[in-house]
Regions:
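Phosphate/dinucleotide-binding and metal-coordinating scaffold of catalytic cores
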Residues: 1-211
Length: 211
């Protein structure tokens, strides 16, 4: 179930249902608007590949997830964190590494820090996916520890080795939702605002933060 939690809504509203199917390594997605959403917000187009009418709609063959949801997907840094977490878990559990889809990336991101205004549930009366009463976004005062963790992860990438789980665990929730390739994480400042902290990279040949 897909909910809109846009800043101009008084409370989250159910938009529709997103479905996902993987067959022989090929992913397909379906979406169906709820009648109530179309009645109240039928003039609002969420994506150029979704028409505002009732009934099931599907992504075209060879196309990934609908555009409005792809905007919330992590970029290279976030995908690296999620991929490495899956590889470490697979090693610990003595199983094959799962091929992660856009759907896995979408729901693998922490609910509070996910880019955009979409929220997801597996059942109408359930909790939002990957949401927790204990906020997983660290305070700004943890910045040095986060920088150290990002440096260790970059080092392991250079050496083509898996990082320690403690470094991934420290960054995967606050860092996986953000775009771009540079190491970064979401943090909460002293005024409880959600901010983006960009870190130095081992690949930097100048002080990118100072620039």
């Amino acid at each position: 179930y897909v909910f809109a939690d846009f800043d101009w809504l008084k409370e989250p509203r159910l938009i529709g249902e997103l479905s996902y199917e993987s067959l022989r390594g090929s992913d397909s997605y379906g979406f169906c608007y709820k009648d109530e959403w179309l009645k109240d917000y039928g003039g609002l187009f969420l994506s150029d590949d979704l028409n505002n009418y009732p009934g099931q709609q599907y992504t075209t063959p060879g196309k990934d997830i609908f555009g409005c949801f792809s905007d919330a997907l992590p970029d290279r840094w976030g995908r690296t964190l999620i991929n490495r977490r899956e590889q470490i878990l697979a090693k610990d559990e003595k199983r094959l590494v799962r091929r992660l889809s856009s759907f896995d990336y979408l729901i693998g991101i922490e609910d509070f820090s996910r880019m955009g205004g979409f929220r997801f549930k597996e059942s109408m009366d359930g909790e939002y996916i990957n949401a927790s009463e204990s906020l997983h976004i660290p305070p700004l005062t943890d910045i040095r520890e986060l920088i150290a963790a990002s440096s260790e992860i970059e080092k392991s990438e250079e050496e083509d080795q898996l990082p320690e789980m403690r470094w991934i665990a420290q960054l995967v929730q606050p860092g996986s939702s953000l775009g771009g390739a540079r190491p970064k994480a979401s943090v909460i400042d002293e005024n409880k605002n959600l901010c983006i902290a960009k870190f130095p990279s081992r690949k930097d040949d100048y002080d990118a933060g100072l620039w």
